[in-house]
């Protein structure tokens, strides 16, 4: 249930922000509002997840919320990030390493997909969205700082489908 709730946070933030912009007649076109406004909404969704008021500002790391923002913005970016995460997880057996590397790839993947499909949008807009994606990815990496320390020390827990027997 937590998985579904975390995934819904990012998607709902993007879709709701897009709907509000359309209702208010902001002048943003259907082609670009979902990206720029989606990234802004996504950043706030991640911050709300990481620093929830009702848990005394101690929340999650923002991975699922962050990746679901990309699902709401561009499913191809989402799919690419999931594949990157899965490949790293299968090779290394570290969920945290997969999350960190996928987060680090956010700006690159965002830039490439938006560059290929940008049409007549100016390059500054592409760089703005890439910067916002980088901010989201950097925040997720920052939230994994204890995992990074454990990875360096060699005592991070590996992922397994099998439970450990006592």
Residue positions per predicted region:
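Multi-pass membrane catalytic core of lipid/isoprenoid biosynthesis enzymes
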Residues: 1-18
